[in-house]
Amino acid sequence: LNQKHRYTLRFIWCGSEEQGLLGSRAYVEAHKEELSKILLCLNFDMTGTIVGSHRLMVTGNSEIDHYIKFLAKEIGFITKFCDDVHHSDSAPFANEGIPAIGFMRDGQAGGHSRFDIPWPLSGEQLAAATDYAKALIHRIDSARTFPFNRTIDPKMAETVANYIHPKN
């Protein structure tokens, strides 16, 4: 990624996800004027665990889904795919109409409990997800036009809104 970029890349870290997405909600609220310029959110949550398999979760549209599947196949990144709302820091962005790709590994046990400890992390698994993310960012950044629409399918947008603002 040591090159001049076609698009602005912004890396943010959000705190207090487990307490209700407090950091990502605060970021979205503090940057309302800039949100229309954000084309995509990549969210990394539980990507480096030894147990499980890679998973990419698209909160967006089928164009994004096809794009990431093609790239994964092209570079040999073995992963599962799903289209759903990632219950993580990308959700407040998706609620504002910003598509998201969630990077994670499924199959880990003990998350969000006293058993949520760092020893089951794998540098190899984290590197695999990072290599795919770098390839994705490079591919998008090298495109003459942004490669997919900045949209979230209506049914998915409704699911996001219900997650962000639950009706108790």
Named regions from a protein language model:
Residues 1, 7, 109-168:
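His/Asp/Glu-rich mid-to-C-terminal helical/loop segments that flank catalytic regions of hydrolases
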Residues 1-4, 13, 31, 72-76, ...:
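Sec/Tat-exported extracytoplasmic proteins
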Residues 14-108:
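Metal-dependent peptidase/peptidase-like ectodomains
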